[in-house]
Each structure stands twice: as C-alpha cells, then as structure tokens.
A protein has these predicted regions:
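Helix-loop-helix junctions within the multi-pass membrane cores of secondary transporters/permeases
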Residues: 26-108, 158, 162
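Select transmembrane alpha-helical segments in multipass membrane proteins
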Residues: 24-25, 140
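Transmembrane alpha-helical segments and their short flanking loops
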Residues: 78-169
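Transmembrane helical segments that form the transport core of multi-pass membrane transport proteins
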Residues: 8, 13-17
C-alpha cells in the first residue's frame, strides 16, 4: 500500500524513486519507532528539505497532513473491524465494509497523531454497526505492531503529499 507512493511521486514530480526512498527513510524509522506522526514531524521537514520542496509549501502542508491525513487508517481499521466481526460470528456484507471504510476515513481526520490514536475513533463505528465494543480491547492488544507500520505509511504519505502539492504549485 505504502509502496504505491514511490512510483506515484516519481512519475508526477520527477524525483527519482531512490532519492525519495533515501529522503523518507529517516522519517519512516522515527515513525516506526515512536508510532507517532507528530514525533516524526521534524524529520519530515528535513526530508522535504532534502527533496527541495519549498519551505512555504512544507511549512503549511506537513502540519496539516500530520493532523488530518491518515493515509493507512481506513484500510487497516476496516480490516481490524472485519477481524473482530468474524471473531464474534458476525457477518459483514461488502456494502457494510465499504460504509465502515468511509466512516473510518472521515473519522480519521479526528484521530490524534499519537501512538494508537486511530483506535480512539473506532468506538462510534462499532456502536453504529452493533459490533461488540469489547473487540476494540483485542485490537489494542495487537495494535503495537500494526501501528508501527501504519505510522510508517502515514509519514511517507505526508512527505509524498507535500512533494505532489509542490509540483502542482
């Protein structure tokens, strides 16, 4: 999922895949280790600077992206919801899964950039679907590992969005 950003950035911005990968690697390492997009923000600025993204763009785009743009959340949280529903013997239709993904995508704008912040938005989704809220406790138990990869994808998407907006501007 995250790897789709590399060719996208390369084809739209003329930044080589290697340069993009080298620039975002420190940001990914910090995101992976801290599980916080916010903690990775200084390194994200450094990556944007390495990619020659103008400071007037990165200075606006990156803080907004860290706060609002959760690239990996809808897919991962929908998968977690499907897992919990299956665990409790509840069948979800494809339509319900799409509704879940849309709801999580919209609610992810409100999730904080802190470790496991995306789980905070799950309760309203579970309640509205009649899923057992206790299932979120199971997700919390395994979220340590999952959140590392989600944060890595999110911080990569933050740099990518900054590069794409710089190209448009």
């Amino acid at each position: 999922f995250m790897l789709s950003l590399y060719p996208l950035v390369s084809s739209v911005t003329n930044i080589s895949i290697q340069k993009f990968a080298r620039s975002v690697a420190p940001v990914q390492a910090i995101g992976f280790g801290t599980r916080s997009s916010l903690a990775a923000l200084p390194a994200t600025y450094a990556a944007a600077d390495t990619l020659d993204i103008p400071e007037k763009i990165s200075g606006i785009v990156l803080p907004i992206a860290v706060t609002l743009f959760k690239f990996a959340s809808p897919l991962a949280r929908t998968t977690g919801t499907y897992f919990i529903a299956h665990l409790y013997g509840i069948d979800l239709t494809p339509t319900e899964l799409i509704i879940i993904a849309i709801a999580i995508g919209l609610l992810s704008f409100y999730s904080p950039g802190i470790p496991s912040g995306g789980l905070l938005i799950m309760t309203p989704v579970y309640v509205s679907l009649g899923l057992p809220v206790e299932g979120i406790g199971i997700l919390i138990a395994i979220d340590l590992v999952v959140d590392m990869f989600l944060t890595m994808a999110n911080v990569t998407a933050n740099v990518a969005s900054s590069a794409l907006i710089a190209k448009i501007q």
